[in-house]
Amino acid sequence: LFTLVVLLMVSADMAFAGFGCPRDQYKCNSHCQSIGCRAGYCDAVTLWLRCTCTDCNGKK
């Protein structure tokens, strides 16, 4: 039971830290463009919870 509670807490943190992901990919894209990247998308590897930026000229 304790392990389940910890996993749920970690999942909630990841969902709030996703710059719009998984619900708003446009917000993720806008975030990435605002920091100088070409585009952004919600990463399927993390079940669409993480915003991944592309072509950032040395930034990530």
From Swiss-Prot:
Keywords: Antibiotic, Antimicrobial, Defensin, Disulfide bond, Immunity, Innate immunity, Lipid-binding, Membrane, Secreted, Signal, Target cell membrane, Target membrane. The keyword Secreted applies. GO terms for molecular function: lipid binding. It is found in: Secreted; Target cell membrane. Antibacterial peptide mostly active against Gram-positive bacteria. It acts by selectively inhibiting peptidoglycan biosynthesis through complex formation with the cell wall precursor lipid II (1:1 molar ratio) thus inhibiting cell wall synthesis. It does not disrupt cell membranes. Is noticeably less potent than Cg-Defh2 and Cg-Defm. Shows no or limited activities against Gram-negative bacteria. PROSITE patterns: INVERT_DEFENSINS. InterPro entries: Defensin_invertebrate/fungal, Scorpion_toxin-like_sf. Residues 22-25, 43-49 are annotated as: Binds to membrane interface. Gene3D superfamilies: Knottin, scorpion toxin-like (3.30.30.10). Its main location: secreted. Beta-D-GlcNAc-(1->4)-Mur2Ac(oyl-L-Ala-gamma-D-Glu-L-Lys-D-Ala-D-Ala)-di-trans,octa-cis-undecaprenyl diphosphate binds at residues 19-21, 31, 51. Expressed in hemocytes. Residues 1-17 form the signal peptide. Has the structural arrangement of an alpha-helix connected to a beta-sheet by disulfide bonds (CSalpha/beta). This is Hemocyte defensin Cg-Defh1.
